[in-house]
Amino acid sequence: MRVSKLIKYCFSFLILLLLTSCSSKQSNANIIVPESPKNHIAYFTTEKITIDGKGEENAWKEALWSDSFIDIEGEKIPKFKTQFKMLWDDKNLYFYSKMEDPHIWASLKQRDTVVFYNNDFEIFIDPNGDTHNYMEIELNAYNTLWDLFLTKPYRNNSTVLNQWDIKGFQSNIHVSGTLNDASDIDDYWAIEIAIPWISLQEEIGKKTPILGQTWRINFSRVHWEFDLIDGMYYRKKDDKGGFLPEYNWVWSPQGVINMHQPEKWGFVHFAKKIDQKHQPKFQYPDDNSLVLWMYSQYRSQLDLINDSLKSKSIFPIKGSIES
C-alpha cells in the first residue's frame, strides 16, 4: 500500500473521530516507530532441486539460513530452534525449513483441515506488499496441506478463499527420528517446498521476480504441549478440560498474537549470488519507517473508532469501520 493511500486512510479516520465527538487522552506526539521487520536474501539457482525434504543440493548448502525464530510477540526465546532457507529459479520459489523437536507427532491427514491443531509450519506470502490478496500455507509432519487465500487481513472483514488451491504445489517432509513414536527422542523435522511462479501469476497477477525485487513474506511455527494417552500424542489440556494455548514462534515478530498484520512481515530480496567477496546486501525501502508509523496510526484509529461507535448510543451505527 502506498504512503499516499495510508495518509488518506488515517486522515479520514481522524476526521470521523471529530464528527462523532470521540476523544482520546492518548497523545500521538511521542509515538515510537515500530521496529523494522526482518529481512532475508533468496538466491537464484540453476541446480535442479529435488523436493524430498532433505535439502541436500549444493544450492541449499550455499543458501543463507534465516535468523532463528522468536516468540510472535517478540521477546521470549523458543525452547526449540527453527530456521529456513529460500531459493528461486525460472520456474519455482523454494523453501526449506528445519525445526528442532524431541517429539515429532501429527494426526491430521485431510487436506484443508485446520492444520494448526497439530504442530505445524506456516508461510505467508504477499508479493506486492500492499497487505491485501495474500496466501497462507500450513503443513504438519504428515505433509498435510492447508492452503488458503485472503483478500485482506481479518481486521478488515476479510474474504477467506478456503477452496483455493495452489496449482503445482510440491512439498515433502524429512523426519530425523520417528513420527508418532513416544518411546524415543527425536532430533528435528524438515519441510521442503516448491511453488511454481505460474501459480502466483495466475492467482495474484505477479510475474517471476526480477533481480532486486522484494516481497513481503513471513513464517510461523505452531507448537503444542502434549499428553500421552495409550502411547498416542494429544494436545495437552488444563484442569478444566480446555486446551493449553499454543506456542507461536515466528521469523519476523508481530508484537501481538496475530500473524495477519502483513505490514509487519519480513522483507525477502531476490538476488543472484556473485561470489563470496561480493554478497548482495539488503536495503530497506526509503519510506519504511514512515509506512510502519502510518500503519500503527491506522490500526490505532481503526480500533478507537470501532470501540467508540459501539459505546455511543447517540450515534446508532451497527457494525464496524472497514478498510
Task: Please report, for each region that a protein language model flagged, where it lies by residue.
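Bacterial N-terminal signal peptides that target proteins for export
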Residues: 2-11
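Periplasmic/extracellular, small/polar-rich flexible segments of pilin-like filament-forming proteins
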Residues: 311-323
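Structural preference for beta-rich elements and adjacent junctions enriched in aromatics
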Residues: 22-309, 319
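Bacterial N-terminal signal peptides
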Residues: 10-20
